Amino acid sequence: MMEKKAKIIATLGPAIYSEKKLKKIISLGVDAFRINFSHDITGVKQIISRIRKLENKLNKRIAVIADLQGIKLRIGKISSDKLRIKYKQKFTFDTNKKIGNNLRVCFPYSFIINKIKIGSKIFLDDGKFIFKVIEKNKKSLVTRCLSTNCILSSNKSVHIPNIKIPLNRLTKKDKKDISIAKRMGCNWIALSYIQNSDLIKETRKLINSDIGIISKIENKIAIKNIKEIINESDAIMIARGDLAIDIGHSEVPKVQLELIKKCAALSKPVIVATQMLESMIENASPTRAEINDVATAIFQGADVVMLSAETAIGKNPIQSVKTMSKTILSTEKYKKQHIDEFKSSIDAKKDTMKS
């Protein structure tokens, strides 16, 4: 039986914490687990220990990735796991550290608030939800929700187009999390919101030589400096959520292909991530567009594809992994057949020329 070549990363979360589910998704094709350090990691050390035992039991090498929060903007904690914000409702982002509710949430970046203009749009949760600024002062932004079915939870990412973040170094939290990741035995460190190679070099000084660095490409500046970033990194992740907001959704397919080609040319593994099987968070079956998205990444030459909320908090984590694995196998089989056909055609032409 043909085994898949492309790897699958599954994001750790409550949906797959049990040993039974971990064992099942590893047997279905998961090769690595991602820990999102932007969220609460209480109890994760125990889960990693569980993964290491399964690694030995199943005789399969499993990587663990520590995905650092970095300087990516995020909202604070919210009182409910799923807080619904109504369409056209007023909603405030402020510097108050109190737990958020359906009227406001903490946005602890006064230096960013000062830069935002009335009329600006704020994108939350990898661009899923949009808010428009209608009032502001030094400590808060009053917005109107422009999205239907807006459901927020704690620590979700925030992206504001055309606002430059003047930081390009590890935060105190990142440095602390690197120490935690080392103690946990993580194999990889993923760096968020990379702009150039500086952050990679700083991280390299803090980790052992056997820990790899994954640079997440999420903005125009990173694309501009892509060659130096690829050269200094051990792998690249195309984080399409924030990237789409920064460069425009219609530009992402082209940029994805270009980044995959550049990584191949420099012999660096490349990961395609974000919303690959997003509908399977709720639904047992994927959309045809999602299947095509996974297949396209494999056709283009991606070495790894990643599941995020699908495995972390989704209702169908096992089915999501099964779907991704099956799609990879089908696509790789097709690629192999056609490469073999192409080689046979070339050989036949050579024989004809000789005769």
Where would I find each of the regions flagged by the language model?
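Non-catalytic helical/linker scaffolds that mediate oligomerization, partner binding
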Residues: 1-355
